UniProtKB/Swiss-Prot annotation:
EC number of this enzyme: 3.1.-.-
Keyword ATP-binding: no
GO molecular function, one term: nuclease activity
Lineage: Bacteria, Bacillati, Bacillota, Bacilli, Bacillales
Pfam families attached to this UniProt entry: RuvX
Keywords (A to Z) from UniProt: Cytoplasm, Hydrolase, Nuclease, Ribosome biogenesis
SUPFAM superfamilies per record: Ribonuclease H-like
Enzyme class, UniProt record, top EC level: hydrolase
Protein name per the record: Putative pre-16S rRNA nuclease
GO cellular component: cytosol
C-alpha cells in the first residue's frame, strides 16, 4: 500500500511517497503550480498515483497556531476535495503546522546550502507531513 504525501503551496506542491509497507516517507519531487491560471498539478499527481499504485493521499492542512483554519487552509481543503473527486481515492487532511520549519531544520542540520534548501524545502515538508501521518498509524 503506497501513500502519497502533498505539501500544497501557492506556487508549488511538494510530493513525498511512502515505501510499500507504509513505514517511511521519501521525497519525490516538487510540482510547479499556478493558482491564478487554475493549474494545480492534478495531471502530474494523477500520473504518480498510477505509476506507484497509490491507495491513499495525505494533504497537509495548514492550521493557525490556535487550531483555526485560515484562507490557506481552506484552499488546501478545496485542493484535497478536487483530488478526491478526480482520482476517486481516499484523501486525508493532516495537520502540517510547523512542517516547513521542521524540514528547514533537518536540511540545516544536514549542512545543505541555502540555495539547495530553497529547491527541496517543499519536497521535504511533504516528507515531514507524510512521515507524521505514517507514524500515527
Amino acid at each position: 500500500m503506497r501513500i502519497l504525501g502533498l505539501d500544497v503551496g501557492t506556487k508549488t506542491v511538494g510530493v513525498a511517497m511512502s515505501d510499500e509497507m507504509g513505514w517511511t516517507a521519501q521525497g519525490l519531487e516538487t510540482i510547479r503550480i499556478n493558482e491564478e491560471r487554475g493549474h494545480f498539478g492534478f495531471d502530474r499527481i494523477s500520473e504518480l498515483v498510477k505509476q506507484y499504485n497509490v491507495d491513499k493521499i495525505v494533504v497537509g492542512l495548514p492550521k493557525n497556531m490556535n487550531g483555526t483554519i485560515g484562507p490557506r487552509g481552506e484552499a488546501c481543503q478545496q485542493f484535497a476535495e478536487n483530488l478526491r473527486n478526480l482520482l476517486q481515492l481516499e484523501v486525508v487532511m493532516w495537520d502540517e503546522r510547523l512542517s516547513t520549519m521542521a524540514a528547514e531544520r533537518l536540511l540545516i542540520s544536514a549542512d545543505v546550502s541555502r540555495k539547495k534548501r530553497k529547491q527541496v524545502i517543499d519536497k521535504m515538508a511533504a516528507v515531514v507531513i507524510l512521515q507524521g501521518f505514517l507514524d500515527s498509524k
